[in-house]
Amino acid sequence: MAKATTIKIKLLSTADTGYFYVTTKNSRTMTDKMTKTKYDPVAKKHVEFKEAKIK
């Protein structure tokens, strides 16, 4: 079987609340770490989320 091109990643909040989103990314086209601005319900505002590994 071939290696999958999409991998699951965890987007961890930079507000240090421990809140995270799980999403997928194409590892061949997006080689650098992903960052997105999304809503953190614990902090109750939009913050930047950075990519972290799923354990």
Curated annotation (Swiss-Prot):
Stored Gene3D superfamilies: Ribosomal protein L33
GO cellular component: cytosolic large ribosomal subunit
The keyword Cell inner membrane appears for this protein: no
UniProt xrefs under PROSITE patterns: RIBOSOMAL_L33
GO molecular function: structural constituent of ribosome
Keywords recorded for this protein, A-Z: Ribonucleoprotein, Ribosomal protein
Gene Ontology BP, a term: translation
Similarity remark: Belongs to the bacterial ribosomal protein bL33 family.
Entry-linked PANTHER family: 54S RIBOSOMAL PROTEIN L39, MITOCHONDRIAL, LARGE RIBOSOMAL SUBUNIT PROTEIN BL33M
Designated name of the protein: Large ribosomal subunit protein bL33
Source lineage: Bacteria, Pseudomonadati, Pseudomonadota, Alphaproteobacteria, Hyphomicrobiales
